[in-house]
């Protein structure tokens, strides 16, 4: 467990963490902004993120971005599900699949691993399988001394993302905590008061999910600022960053909010 403590301390060495998620292709295909991983990672890697989140396969394409002492840490995705797939084929009951092992992640250079916990499939057997896989992965992560991140989500077929109703977010957050997550990647519930309730039921630090792209950058930054004030320890952001016109500048702005407690106005100045 000493290894896990060391890696956790590095990720949160500034008290909070900015993680950039680039693993969407495993679920949603080549989304706008990450069609070319080499280009987008080059724009983002040196502009403030504490870690980049991707599959072990993507690491092969962008490995040079992790070579230096000042490089971001690497978080690798181990699994996938189809419950967010809308463009190509809407799912029936939904599936969950384990793709990589913790050993695969470590071989790729990972400093932490991340998995889904999806509640609300049309088939209880799939949900049970998801839980059993997480149990095995948690044990493997503990054996190797690498932080185990869980992304707990409540899904319904009529919602293309995930349900952010506070009681349901609290439920999946506590479920992931009881499984043994070292870090939780959780939906923001819309306001500080309700999100404090989520923070209070968690056993581990919470990073909010960036979620689908917001209408404006200011809207995203305000959500982030509110979440931090409620007790979140950072963010894992994807579409709201790499679908922006200038992701390099926005990465700097987000980092300033997280690490320097900058207000929205200060952060927006970086984008001008």
From Swiss-Prot:
<dbReference type="InterPro" id="IPR050456">
    <property type="entry name" value="DeoC/FbaB_aldolase"/>
</dbReference>
<dbReference type="InterPro" id="IPR002915">
    <property type="entry name" value="DeoC/FbaB/LacD_aldolase"/>
</dbReference>
<dbReference type="InterPro" id="IPR041720">
    <property type="entry name" value="FbaB-like"/>
</dbReference>
<keyword id="KW-0456">Lyase</keyword>
<dbReference type="InterPro" id="IPR013785">
    <property type="entry name" value="Aldolase_TIM"/>
</dbReference>
<feature type="active site" description="Schiff-base intermediate with substrate">
    <location>
        <position position="185"/>
    </location>
</feature>
<dbReference type="Pfam" id="PF01791">
    <property type="entry name" value="DeoC"/>
</dbReference>
<keyword id="KW-0704">Schiff base</keyword>
<comment type="similarity">
    <text>Belongs to the DeoC/FbaB aldolase family.</text>
</comment>
<protein>
    <recommendedName>
        <fullName>Uncharacterized aldolase SSO3226</fullName>
        <ecNumber>4.2.1.-</ecNumber>
    </recommendedName>
</protein>
<dbReference type="GO" id="GO:0004332">
    <property type="term" value="F:fructose-bisphosphate aldolase activity"/>
</dbReference>
<dbReference type="GO" id="GO:0016747">
    <property type="term" value="F:acyltransferase activity, transferring groups other than amino-acyl groups"/>
</dbReference>
């Amino acid at each position: 467990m000493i290894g896990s403590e060391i890696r956790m301390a590095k990720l949160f060495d500034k008290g909070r963490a900015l993680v950039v998620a680039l693993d969407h292709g495993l679920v949603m295909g080549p989304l706008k902004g990450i069609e070319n991983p080499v280009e987008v990672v080059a724009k983002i890697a040196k502009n403030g993120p504490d870690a980049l989140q991707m599959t072990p396969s993507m690491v092969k394409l962008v490995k040079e971005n992790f070579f230096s002492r000042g490089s971001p840490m690497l978080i690798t995705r181990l699994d996938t599900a189809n419950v967010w797939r809308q463009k190509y084929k809407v799912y029936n009951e939904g599936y969950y699949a384990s793709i990589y092992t913790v050993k695969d992640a470590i071989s790729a250079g990972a400093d932490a691993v991340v998995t889904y916990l999806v509640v609300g499939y049309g088939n209880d057997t799939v949900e049970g399988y998801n839980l059993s896989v997480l149990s095995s992965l948690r044990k493997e992560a503990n054996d190797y001394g690498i932080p185990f991140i869980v992304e707990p989500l409540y899904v319904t077929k009529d919602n293309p993302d995930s349900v952010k109703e506070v009681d349901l977010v609290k439920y999946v957050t506590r479920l992931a905590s009881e499984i043994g997550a070292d870090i939780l990647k959780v939906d923001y519930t819309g306001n500080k008061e309700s999100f404090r309730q989520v923070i209070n039921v968690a056993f581990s630090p919470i990073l909010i999910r960036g979620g689908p792209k917001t209408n404006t950058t200011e809207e995203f930054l305000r959500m982030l600022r509110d979440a931090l004030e409620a007790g979140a320890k950072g963010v894992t952001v994807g579409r709201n960053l790499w679908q922006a016109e200038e992701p390099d500048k926005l990465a700097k702005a987000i980092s300033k909010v997280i690490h320097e407690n900058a207000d929205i106005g200060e952060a927006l100045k970086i984008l001008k």
